[in-house]
């Protein structure tokens, strides 16, 4: 399968890319930092630079894909100030909207989309 992964340089993303590579899947990564991705991920993957808050990803990064796994998100550690909460929310919601906009514009979109985020999961931390 050809699988597009966002958030591939994070904890879950790196483990997922490693396993998918072992399985023989073709991997394309959408990342904010292509240089970092090329340094920490296997060399046999395609890497596309994408700012998930500024608009849809490059259309060519999604072409021919069978599935998309969307893992992008602002790290949650640290004090949850109003500004931090906004960054967490935007990193998950805006990035998903931008990704979906690109997928909706495709003639042959991927048949599977998995998005793993939790904007409301953590609850009141007393901050």
Language model regions located:
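Alpha-helical structural signal in soluble globular domains
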Residues: 15, 19, 40, 98, ...
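N-terminal Rossmann NAD(P)H-binding glycine-rich loop of SDR-like oxidoreductase domains
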Residues: 3-23
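NAD(P)H-binding glycine-rich loop region in Rossmannoid oxidoreductase-like domains
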Residues: 35, 39-95
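SDR active-site strand-loop-helix element
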Residues: 6, 30, 68-72, 113-119
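Conserved glycine-rich Rossmann-like NAD(P)H-binding loop of the short-chain dehydrogenase/reductase
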Residues: 25-32
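Conserved Rossmann-fold NAD(P)-dependent oxidoreductase catalytic core, especially the SDR/UDP-sugar
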Residues: 97-127
């Amino acid at each position: 399968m050809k699988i597009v992964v966002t958030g591939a340089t994070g904890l879950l993303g790196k483990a997922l890319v490693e396993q998918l590579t072992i399985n023989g899947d073709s991997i394309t990564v959408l990342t904010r930092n292509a240089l970092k991705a090329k340094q920490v991920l296997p060399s046999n993957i395609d890497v596309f630079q994408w700012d998930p808050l500024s608009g849809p990803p490059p259309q060519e990064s999604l072409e021919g894909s069978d599935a998309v796994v969307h893992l992008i998100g602002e790290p949650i550690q640290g004090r949850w100030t109003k500004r931090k909460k906004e960054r967490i929310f935007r990193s998950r919601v805006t990035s998903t909207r931008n990704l979906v906009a690109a997928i909706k514009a495709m003639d042959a979109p991927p048949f599977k989309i998995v998005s793993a985020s939790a904007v409301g999961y953590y609850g009141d931390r007393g901050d």
